[in-house]
């Protein structure tokens, strides 16, 4: 049996009491959905039930309401993939007064932003991570921040993960999620995803 200090070192003492691999999987799944819109093939996987085990897992962790709301947005509808692509653009890609811009620098300012950007640069250098040139993503895009977090979960003590989460994500995600919920979209898939993302991360890194 692992001692308390060993559990902390391995990152197992997160508030959700789930494994490193489970945490990484959930964050990787969220990251992929925030990076680009769903393809028709990916949408088909959801509608065939290929993600039902993930949804059941999230419900078991206590995120039943958020998960059910997300599932409801995936019910078949005419031209669904096109609607989802349009919703992705409306939610994340328009001007900041219309969309939920997925960049840390759109929400943080001054010293708080400087501290966060320095931390991001530090870990990007440490892990030799580069930005996605194809997607033209700056280093403060939420998907880049999640890529760093996923690496930290696998390799760093929990307090290091928590420091990054609090300084580079949790201090602006609530406003990001609020704006995502206020966008005018047909399916609300991305708003519900953002709600689940914030709920999961808040619980995962609860003090």
From Swiss-Prot:
Predominant cellular place of this UniProt entry's protein: cytoplasm
Record keyword Repeat present: no
Keywords: Chaperone, Cytoplasm
PANTHER family, per database record: CHAPERONE PROTEIN TORD, CHAPERONE PROTEIN YCDY
Family as reported in the entry's similarity comment: Belongs to the TorD/DmsD family. TorD subfamily.
Known function: Involved in the biogenesis of TorA. Acts on TorA before the insertion of the molybdenum cofactor and, as a result, probably favors a conformation of the apoenzyme that is competent for acquiring the cofactor.
Name the record gives this protein: Chaperone protein TorD
Lineage of origin: Bacteria, Pseudomonadati, Pseudomonadota, Gammaproteobacteria, Pasteurellales
Gene of this entry: torD
